[in-house]
């Protein structure tokens, strides 16, 4: 997939977001001006300031980060994590952060799930960083008259290497069976415009990006099989 193709896909998505269509939720007022999507920045936010200046954003614009943002990777109170959060907090934009396999769960950092008026759904955030929202797994959000279901988490293919090197790895990176059942019970039969995930359904795995030297037969596909449903 080329950069041009991805740009065209994002352009088509933005065009769809400008059209109202009913989903499972039906709110008559959208407080969000624009929705952007990006993933796997892994703690690199050097682009954010220029992006906000170019797009002339405000905190009523939402950037969805589809996993592995780095904002909940280093640990609460750690210098690197605080620096990244400070950078994002200073940017005139709201981030809706979906959990990746290299992200800690917000609840593990002392946050609680609560209603947010801007994205019209339940999410996590720290009071000192009100424009950094962490999406709940299996939560629905309503922006630009469209519904967004977020399902975070994935299996780390480099899990054993990380453990061997004593690098950060989160044992609850995948959804539990109970969490999967709850998502199915909550939203089965309910229309949603977009499902934002970190990993892909099994039939849509980007096999051309698989890491060389890793035996795929020993890699957990629980999340991919679940999303395939």
Task: List where the protein language model places each region.
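Active-site-proximal loop/helix segment associated with metal-binding centers of metalloenzymes
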Residues: 4, 8-14, 18, 22, ...
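Core catalytic region of metal-dependent phosphoesterases/phosphodiesterases
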Residues: 6, 23, 34, 38, ...
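Short boundary motifs at domain starts and secondary-structure transition points
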Residues: 24-30
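Acidic/glycine-enriched edge-of-secondary-structure segments
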Residues: 32-38, 166-169
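Histidine-centered catalytic micro-motifs
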Residues: 41-42, 199-201, 229
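Short hydrophobic patches on amphipathic alpha-helices
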Residues: 52-55, 187, 227
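Short, intrinsically disordered, charge-balanced linker/junction segments flanking boundaries
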Residues: 221-229
């Amino acid at each position: 997939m080329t950069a041009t193709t991805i740009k065209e896909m994002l352009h088509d998505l933005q065009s769809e977001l400008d059209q109202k269509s009913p989903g499972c939720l039906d709110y008559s007022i959208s407080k969000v001006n624009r929705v952007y999507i990006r993933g796997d920045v892994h703690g690199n936010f050097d682009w954010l300031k220029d992006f906000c200046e170019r797009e002339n954003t405000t905190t009523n614009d939402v950037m969805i980060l589809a996993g592995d943002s780095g904002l909940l990777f280093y640990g609460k109170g750690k210098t690197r994590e605080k620096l990244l959060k400070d950078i994002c907090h200073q940017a005139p934009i709201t981030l809706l952060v979906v959990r990746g396999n290299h992200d800690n769960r917000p609840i593990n950092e002392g946050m609680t799930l609560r209603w947010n008026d801007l994205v019209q759904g339940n999410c996590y955030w720290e009071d000192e960083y009100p424009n950094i929202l962490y999406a709940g797994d299996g939560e629905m959000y309503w922006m630009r008259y469209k519904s967004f279901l977020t399902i975070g988490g994935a299996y780390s293919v480099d899990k054993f290497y990380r453990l061997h090197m004593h690098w950060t790895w989160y044992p609850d990176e995948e959804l539990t069976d109970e969490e999967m059942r709850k998502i199915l019970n909550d939203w089965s039969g309910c229309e949603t415009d977009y499902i934002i995930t970190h990993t892909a359904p099994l039939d849509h795995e980007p096999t051309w990006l698989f890491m060389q030297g890793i035996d795929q037969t020993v890699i957990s596909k629980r999340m991919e099989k679940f999303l395939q449903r």
